[in-house]
Amino acid sequence: GAISALGGLGSLPGKLGIIGGGVMGEALLSCLLSKRMYAPDSILVSDLSHERRQLLAEQYDIQTTHSNREVIEHSDVIVLSIKPQVFDSVARDFAGIVVGAPHLVISILAGVSLSRLEQAVPGWPVIRAMPNTPATVGCGMTAIAVGNRAITENVEVAQQLFSAVGDVVQVAEPLLDGVTGLSGSGPAYVAIVIESLADG
């Protein structure tokens, strides 16, 4: 499908949907656009705030919607960039979606496990990512943990996506949760990188 064929150098396949246009969602959006990994017309962002949607649409020339379901139905890669406490309501937006070509779902929600994500998402590959705070200025480190349904191409897409905001390291999920409480703290990321180098 669209996901398995990586586009030309620097560009990513298909349509990108971001659910949640807050600080992290916007940081990713702005880095992806500035590095030309996606064209503005390939990105759809959902946010409940009308003001936020208007600001993102005007500033980045992208499409926005209040409907998470619209993002889910029209995107090849879906980034969940919402607060963990609203995950259950967003999970309901996935209910009953007919599985066509599998969409890749990437979650940057702290503390929401791969197994919970996989239960919410019908048969699609899931990857968790934990960008640290400097990622908002494009010089961060993102740790990713890969779900059971994700294949190599999915991992490559996630790595390419987060390379827009800095370095990417793949870790086991417990390591990801180990830094959740310290999200944004440099030492925790150094510890992860050292441990992943030791493992690998």
Regions found by a protein language model. Give the residues of each.
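NAD(P)+-binding Rossmann beta1-loop-alpha1 motif at the extreme N-terminus of oxidoreductases
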Residues: 1-66, 70-73, 139-140
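Short, well-ordered alpha-helices that flank and scaffold nucleotide-derived cofactor binding pockets
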Residues: 26, 30-34, 58, 92, ...
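Aromatic-residue-lined binding/catalytic grooves and analogous aromatic/hydrophobic interfacial grooves
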Residues: 186
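Rossmann-like NAD(P)(H) cofactor-binding subdomain of soluble oxidoreductases
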Residues: 50, 60, 68-80, 84-144
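Catalytic, metal-anchored helix/loop core of enzyme active sites in primary metabolism
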Residues: 182
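Conserved beta-strand termini and adjacent loop/short-helix elements that scaffold enzyme active sites
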Residues: 46, 65-67, 129, 171-174
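A short, flexible low-complexity segment enriched in Lys/Arg and Gly/Pro that occurs
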Residues: 1-3, 105-110, 115, 157-165
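Internal alpha-helical scaffold of NAD(P)-dependent oxidoreductase catalytic cores
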Residues: 116-125, 141-179, 189-200
